[in-house]
């Protein structure tokens, strides 16, 4: 039923996205691969479309982690070389959501992800940007400025997989650099982002894979999920904050029979709604 409903709308969506992002796609950088924190071995085989210029690809934010002296994890090497917080769930999560986009929408989407470095201006190639474990990021002043410019020009940033009071404080410190004059608010149920494709009034906490061991949907002191955001002056949502939940794991484990289907289903629906919202607003 959803697919039929979506296909009726998709002609306008696809046409609109072609107008908005068709010119941008001509300047997209080639695919870059990095060793991931969970998946350190680079894939040997890539799909045929891995270098195709498309309307959308899973654009994953690269960022410097919080210093170990302030409680950050100790990593070997530079965050610019992978195996840092920004690579959590990468690339499996990215490719599962990309497969859902290709299967359930008419958006011209690539099968593989694209790591994005704010220091190089990559963000302007993509209308939708995803950041994971942002309770561990520490943006520089220049990176915050680059993010602000991207968002005010029409970009969209979705962040996910951080939990509890301490991680929120680290997240908010860097986001305050991006928008010192804009508040973070709870997104109301009536916001179009919850009704772009799916009606998502009935939302619940989506846990990470740790749920399979603990049977708890929360981590640390983050017992209640929050869908928060930052709006521009025209009431467009620029930043969608998925706090005290782990949508990335729900995508990553969508094909794991032990991970409950209801969590993957909601996680994918939220991801698709946010993506289509980003490409049409």
Residue map of PLM features:
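Extracytoplasmic/secreted envelope proteins and their assembly/folding machinery
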Residues: 94, 98, 144, 148, ...
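An acidic, glycine-rich "communication" segment
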Residues: 33-40, 66, 70-73, 166-248, ...
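Bacterial N-terminal signal peptides
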Residues: 10-22
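Aromatic-Pro/Gly-enriched surface loop or interdomain linker
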Residues: 27-128, 134-135, 246-249, 253-281
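A generic secondary-structure signal for well-formed alpha-helical elements
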Residues: 105, 155, 178-182, 278
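Surface-exposed patches in mature extracellular/periplasmic domains of secreted proteins
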Residues: 107-117, 159-164, 182-190
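Short alpha-beta junction capping motif
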Residues: 58, 123-168
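N-terminal secretory signal peptides that target proteins for export/translocation
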Residues: 1-7
């Amino acid at each position: 039923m959803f697919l039929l409903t979506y296909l009726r709308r998709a002609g306008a969506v696809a046409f609109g996205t072609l107008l908005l992002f068709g010119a941008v796609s001509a300047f997209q950088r080639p695919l870059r691969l990095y060793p991931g924190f969970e998946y350190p071995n680079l894939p040997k085989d890539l799909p045929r479309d891995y270098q195709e210029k498309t309307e959308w690809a899973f654009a994953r934010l690269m960022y410097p982690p919080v210093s170990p002296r302030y409680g950050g994890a100790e990593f070997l090497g530079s965050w610019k070389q992978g195996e840092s917080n920004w690579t959590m769930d990468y690339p499996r999560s990215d490719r599962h959501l990309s497969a859902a986009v290709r299967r359930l929408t008419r958006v011209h989407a690539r099968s593989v992800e694209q790591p994005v470095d704010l220091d190089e201006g990559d963000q302007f190639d993509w209308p939708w940007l995803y950041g994971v474990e942002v309770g561990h990021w520490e943006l520089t002043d220049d990176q915050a400025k680059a993010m602000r410019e991207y968002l005010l020009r029409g970009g969209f940033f979705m962040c996910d997989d951080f939990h509890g009071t301490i991680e929120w404080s680290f997240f908010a410190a860097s986001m305050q650099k991006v928008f010192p004059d804009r508040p973070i608010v709870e997104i109301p149920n009536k916001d179009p982002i919850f009704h772009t494709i799916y009606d998502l009034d009935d939302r619940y906490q989506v846990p990470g894979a740790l749920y399979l061991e603990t049977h708890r949907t929360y981590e640390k002191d983050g017992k209640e999920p929050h869908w928060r955001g930052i709006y521009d002056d025209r009431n467009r949502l620029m930043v969608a904050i998925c706090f005290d939940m782990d949508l990335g794991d729900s995508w990553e484990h969508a094909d794991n029979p032990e991970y409950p289907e209801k969590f993957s289903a909601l996680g994918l629906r939220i991801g698709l709604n946010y993506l289509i919202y980003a490409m049409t607003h």
